[in-house]
Amino acid sequence: MNGQYKIFNNCDELVLSFNGLVECYDYTGMKDKCSYTFMDVNELNINLNKNGYYSLKCDLFDGRLDFDFYLNDFYVCNGNLVVDVNISSGMYEFGALSTLEFSLNDNKRIWLDMRGCAKKKYISASYLKNGFQKKIKNEVIVIEGKYIHDYYSFYCELGYSIFGNYGYIGSSLNAVYDILNDTIDKKINLIWKDSFISFKAIDNTVPEDYYQSSSEDILVLLNDYFNIILE
């Protein structure tokens, strides 16, 4: 079993391997429920059980793609395996692989074409591609507030302004704190352009179950690491 993707059962036994992972569709709209195609499966006998728990591990992205899943159903088609699963753990967000496949070398702010929570796919793609980065792109950080249209686009823009394209800064203030705390030793300058309108965009779209996540909370946190200039 030498495919770059491997599936393990809940006893950590290797049950199959394959050479390509295709994100098919989040067809129900239910969180974490989606379908994939496992391409070029290396085993003739598929040793999987419906309604079972499994783990996917792969050689790509230094293990950042790995996740656990519950297998609802599957079928074999032309040497490929189509599966219906619920993802139960991991930092991978469905759609991140497709984002990288079609926009890996795109230097523009590709999240601007994504609506609402779909921006989490870009954030997850940033984590897959670059992980936790340590090198800041510029001596002065410039946040372009005109590109912040909602809560999640703030995290896209912040990661972009600090680390560059596909810069990962998380999708919550707890994650921002952890990353900045490990990255910044002394305060550096941060210019936030079009700050007022971006504050409104953030505050009007904070998810209902997110507490202490307003623009005011963001400024309090960033002030510990930056000399902030609001424009």
Predicted feature descriptions by range:
Residues 165-177:
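Extended catalytic/binding region for NAD+/ADP-ribose chemistry, centered on the ART fold
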Residues 1-3, 8-113:
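Phosphate/adenylate-binding glycine loop and adjacent helical scaffold
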Residues 174-207:
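Short, structured protein-protein interaction patches enriched in aromatics and acidic/basic residues
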Residues 139-141, 186-194, 226-228:
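Hydrophobic beta-strand segments of well-ordered beta-sheets in folded domains
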